[in-house]
């Protein structure tokens, strides 16, 4: 019942942009949250620039997450350490708790650590998809203690969040630390397969897992062409 409510509440009933990741292991479809507009628009921009095409899932940790978006991974040699390839700007954190949190299937932005990045601004390109594990009350209480220290008591695991972490799974210790800006709506079996793959000492899969192509399949926020531009498009089509 909780899962149905999470997906059908007014917060998630709005039309959302969607992106399809075609990977060597199967397809993953992602819906982007309107509540994180800066991250949503940036992800759409990076996808539109085709920067994700041919990049690896360069960091994979079982029962935790799978990460991609390192711009240096496109032509990386086997065994090379990855994780530093990024664009030259960052995005202001958009924490939206308790609505958006690190449940299984959440898509979040990677970033530099707190010492170099105390505002917890997101990197512009690298992202991860949460797998995580299921938690019990005792372990969630310990996570809450840690979050209280890291966030000066501003991040609280609500009963609704706790229920999801206990029944579905996720990574609650990342809440309030990294911006969640989307969710996987198709292809969780692909994520499960990737997160179980054998990795090297750098957490890179021993067999390359690659995003073949990233495509915007739905974007209700794309600007509508002006009438004159539509006519020009029609003329071009007629000339062909």
Feature roles, as predicted:
Residues 11-240:
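Cyclophilin-like peptidyl-prolyl cis-trans isomerases
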Residues 1-10:
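Bacterial N-terminal signal peptides
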């Amino acid at each position: 019942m909780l899962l149905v409510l999470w997906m059908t509440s007014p917060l998630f009933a709005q039309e959302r942009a969607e992106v399809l990741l075609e990977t060597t292991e199967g397809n993953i479809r992602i819906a982007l949250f309107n509540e994180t507009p800066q991250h949503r628009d940036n992800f759409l921009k990076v996808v539109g620039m085709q920067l994700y095409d041919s990049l690896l899932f360069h960091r994979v940790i079982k029962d935790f997450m799978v990460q991609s978006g390192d711009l240096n991974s496109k032509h990386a040699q086997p065994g090379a350490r990855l994780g530093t390839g990024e664009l030259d700007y960052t995005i202001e954190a958009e924490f939206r708790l308790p609505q958006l949190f690190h449940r299984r299937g959440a898509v979040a932005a990677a970033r530099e650590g707190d010492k170099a990045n105390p505002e917890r601004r997101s990197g512009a390109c690298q992202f991860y998809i949460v797998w995580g594990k299921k938690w019990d009350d005792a372990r969630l209480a310990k996570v809450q203690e840690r979050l209280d220290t890291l966030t000066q008591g501003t991040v609280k695991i609500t009963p609704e969040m706790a229920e999801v972490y206990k029944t579905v799974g996720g990574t609650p210790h990342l809440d309030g630390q990294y911006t969640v800006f989307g969710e996987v709506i198709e292809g969780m079996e692909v994520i499960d397969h990737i997160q179980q793959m054998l990795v090297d000492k750098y957490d890179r899969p021993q067999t390359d897992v690659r995003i073949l192509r990233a495509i915007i399949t739905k974007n209700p926020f794309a600007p509508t062409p002006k009438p004159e531009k539509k006519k020009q498009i029609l003329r071009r089509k007629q000339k062909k």
